[in-house]
Amino acid sequence: MVKIRLKRAGRKKLPVYQIVVADARSPRDGKFLEVVGTYQPTAKPHAVTIKKDRIVYWMQTGAQPTATVNSLIRTTGLLYELRLKSMGRSEAEISAEMEKWQEHQAVRRQKRLALKSHRRSAKKEAEAKAATGGEA
């Protein structure tokens, strides 16, 4: 069975992963068939680059992405695009849907960042209140 999975590269404490197509029996950093992308988890925001055409080819050939790679592919919108193609949509409809999807993802990202900053400020206020309350 062929898998699409991560292969670790980089150095100690600074991982960079290659998204590779490999036989399921080969070790994590062992022999692989093709490099189809990269993933940098230490970059802010996480950097994912993929070769969409090659991933589509390998998935149609029968390669199964691991759970982590599947979520990385999903963040790029490739799975949604493939689903639209399988539903028989035209290229114009697919491009319009993908634009809407990207806008929706940008809104979700902004909401997540706003919520994160709100929680951070609330935590700081609570700590400051506890510090001043503890002194009195």
Swiss-Prot record:
GO terms for biological process: translation. The keyword Ribonucleoprotein applies. SUPFAM superfamilies: Ribosomal protein S16. Gene3D superfamilies: 3.30.1320.10. GO terms for cellular component: cytoplasm; small ribosomal subunit. Keywords: Ribonucleoprotein, Ribosomal protein. InterPro entries: Ribosomal_bS16, Ribosomal_bS16_CS, Ribosomal_bS16_dom_sf. GO terms for molecular function: structural constituent of ribosome. Residues 113-122 have a biased composition (Basic residues). Residues 113-136 are annotated as: Disordered. HAMAP family: Ribosomal_bS16. Belongs to the bacterial ribosomal protein bS16 family. This is Small ribosomal subunit protein bS16. It comes from Pelodictyon phaeoclathratiforme (strain DSM 5477 / BU-1).
